[in-house]
A protein has these predicted regions:
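N-terminal cap/lid segment of alpha/beta-hydrolase-fold proteins
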Residues: 28-47
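Conserved HGGG/HGGXW glycine-rich cap/lid loop of the alpha/beta-hydrolase fold
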Residues: 45-102
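Active-site loop/oxyanion-hole signature of alpha/beta-hydrolase fold enzymes
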Residues: 94-137, 321
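Conserved hydrolase catalytic core segment
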Residues: 128-171
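Flexible "cap/lid" loop of the alpha/beta hydrolase fold
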Residues: 156-195
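Alpha/beta-hydrolase
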Residues: 185-277
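Conserved loop-alpha-helix segment in the C-terminal half of the alpha/beta-hydrolase fold
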Residues: 263-306
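Catalytic active-site module of serine/aspartate enzymes centered on a nucleophile-bearing elbow/loop
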Residues: 298-333
Length: 333
């Protein structure tokens, strides 16, 4: 395992030799570009919305981004359309999320079916090999896909790495211990049978998020980001789906993912083409993700300085620089 980046200068140094400055300028100019092509791809259970920016026939392999949740949308990746100056950037909403169909049938809420969506998109776009980037719940889908379809994967990025519910809950409990004593007590009470008033629980959740998932120093959304989200958010976050698969609380799993653990699949990855990517203050604890990287021979680990679980929104330039450099290096091999 190699630790790729702990500081901004290191992150930007991973951009191609053409220069980090040029990459930053490109990101500013092309981030949050509206979709150049949109299509609805048939999958098991309905159709998923897909957008493409950039040239699918470019020399550099396309990259697809897989959003978290379950039940969230692709919009958190909108700034990464900046990468379309070198390769096709593919974004999509999972079934029952955002711009995709919303049958809201719990029979569809299975890991294998979500993995199947990704393969259906690849076939619809006639892509032979692509880079697969997942974040949070999307990292689990990326891992499952890369383990099942290695011939079609140029590289795998597991961002804000969720691949095991037991590990995630253990990590969350450790993170809670670093919060203010009163916040710790409130969270424990809110997870118990005699819950305090709802506002106290919401305040405790906000305190946790401010530390690990949406830090207060995040830059405000640009006009371009706001316009992009308004245009492509669709029906937005699906709380029913989230609660069914995870549960109503960030601090405990009560849904169908309660026993989920894909850690054994790490052994099936091509480690030299695998990057673990987390924020410095990520809800996905660095110690846990470092262990995952050690289980994946040859894998790299990159840390976005100053970022939490929402590192892409909080540190967009650093995130774009890391990904740009990683994708270029894996294209060359």
């Amino acid at each position: 395992m190699r630790l790729t980046a702990l500081f901004v200068v290191a992150a930007l140094a991973l951009t191609p030799p053409v220069s980090a400055r040029q990459a930053v300028q490109t990101a500013a100019a092309r981030a949050w570009a509206m979709p150049e092509r949109e299509l609805m791809v048939p999958v098991e259970g309905g159709r998923v919305w897909v957008s493409v920016n950039g040239d699918l026939k470019a020399t550099a392999a396309p990259v697809v981004f897989i959003h978290g949740g379950p039940g969230s949308t692709h919009t958190g990746f909108g700034g990464l359309t900046a990468l379309a100056d070198q390769r096709a950037v593919i974004l999509y909403d999972q079934l029952d999320s955002g711009m995709s169909d919303h049958p809201n049938d719990p029979a569809n809420w299975r890991v294998a079916r979500f993995v199947g969506e990704l393969e259906a998109i690849r076939k619809a776009l006639k892509i032979e090999r692509w880079h697969v980037v997942g974040h949070s719940w999307g990292a689990a889908i990326a891992l499952e896909y890369a383990a099942s379809y290695p011939a079609h994967v140029a590289s795998t990025v597991l961002g804000g790495t969720f691949i095991s519910t037991p590990h995630w809950i253990l990590g969350t409990n450790l993170l809670i211990r670093d919060l203010a004593p009163q916040v710790q007590r409130d969270i424990l009470a809110c997870e118990g049978n005699n819950r305090p008033p709802a506002e106290k629980c919401k305040a405790a959740e906000r305190a946790f998020s401010a530390a690990y998932n949406g830090r207060p120093d995040a830059p405000p959304r640009s006009p371009e980001a706001q316009a992009y989200r308004k245009r492509t958010q669709g029906k937005g976050f699906n709380e029913k789906l989230y609660n069914a698969m995870w549960g109503p609380s960030e601090f405990s799993a009560r849904g169908s993912l309660v026993g989920y653990d894909a850690t054994p699949l790490l052994a099936k990855l091509d480690g030299k083409r695998t990057l673990f990517l987390v924020g410095q203050y990520d809800e996905a604890r660095l110690d846990t993700v470092r262990d995952y990287a050690r289980l994946t021979a040859g894998a790299e680990l990159a840390v976005v300085p100053g970022g939490s679980h929402s590192f892409g929104a909080e540190r967009p330039v650093e995130t774009e620089g890391l990904l740009r450099g990683w994708l270029a290096r894996k294209d060359a091999k």
